[in-house]
Amino acid sequence: ISKVFDQFDIPYEAKVISAHRTPDEMYDYAKKAKGRGIQYIIAGAGGAAHLPGMIASSTEIPVLGVPIPTKHLEGNDSLLSIVQMPKGVPVATFAIGEAGAINSALFVISMISTHNEDVEKKLVKYREKQKKKVLEMKLDS
């Protein structure tokens, strides 16, 4: 996630918080995030994966949940935990693992691009690079 934001010159804050092991810190973080100028929160969680939902219940800031692969259920437990939010407490849920993490950052960048022309130009350039890379691929005969 940080590499993606760095590519687009998007400032970010990274922090390790656990919904189960540091609940007071989690609530404090969520409640004070808006006051620090944070506009979006990406929360990765594995297993019971309560972090994204608990953060979403404590702030009006959009929360994006990324399921982290787990040893026993390969992240399916995390995915189901994050995606099954009750109505009224939304969490945008992404794919399990690295693809979900990268896409969550790109989703934030896409939202920022709607009101930031510089970010929009970088996003268009990024997607053009992706397109070019695919078009240049060769299949082995």
Regions found by a protein language model. Give the residues of each.
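Short glycine/serine/threonine-rich phosphate/pyrophosphate-binding segments
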Residues: 23-24, 45-54, 73-76, 101-104
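Glycine-rich phosphate/diphosphate-binding loop of Rossmann-like nucleotide-binding domains
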Residues: 1-21
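Active-site-proximal loop->helix
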Residues: 2-3, 7, 26-31, 74-88
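Generic helix-packing signal
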Residues: 6, 34-37, 105-112
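Short coil/turn connectors at secondary-structure junctions
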Residues: 8-11, 36-39, 59-63, 86-91
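Glycine-rich phosphate-binding loop
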Residues: 29-67, 71
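Short beta->alpha connector loops at strand-helix junctions that form conserved
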Residues: 16-18, 45, 66-69, 93-95
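C-terminal binding/interaction regions
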Residues: 13, 76-141
